[in-house]
Swiss-Prot record:
Stated name of the protein: DNA-binding protein Fis
Function: Activates ribosomal RNA transcription. Plays a direct role in upstream activation of rRNA promoters.
Keyword Flavoprotein: no
Record keywords: Activator, DNA-binding, Transcription, Transcription regulation
Family: Belongs to the transcriptional regulatory Fis family.
Keyword Transcription: yes
Organism of provenance: Pectobacterium atrosepticum (strain SCRI 1043 / ATCC BAA-672) (Erwinia carotovora subsp. atroseptica)
An example Gene Ontology molecular-function term: DNA-binding transcription factor activity
InterPro entries the UniProt entry points to: Fis_DNA-bd, Homeodomain-like_sf, HTH_Fis, Trans_regulatory_Fis
DNA-binding region: 74-93
SUPFAM superfamilies the UniProt entry points to: Homeodomain-like (SSF46689)
Lineage: Bacteria, Pseudomonadati, Pseudomonadota, Gammaproteobacteria, Enterobacterales
Subunit structure: Homodimer.
Amino acid sequence: MFEQRVNSDVLTVSTVNSQAQVTQKPLRDSVKQALKNYFAQLNGQDVSDLYELVLAEVEQPLLDMVMQYTRGNQTRAALMMGINRGTLRKKLKKYGMN
């Protein structure tokens, strides 16, 4: 079970382990662990477009949740994300979310 919270300008992820203990860690730690797992599975193979892969994994759910939070209001969503509305529209189109 995952839950994201804003705490002192740091996104955190809460996890519940098998002993029903809740722990929180910064989202960046989860990204770091996911990348470690990804690299371990590569077995020395070259990879390209890693930046795009990671960005897409984070950007799409970010856009989805912000659009839900703002009830589809693109102006509010763009302000919330700190990007201009045209950029937001381009990103929404990229992920088929328009």
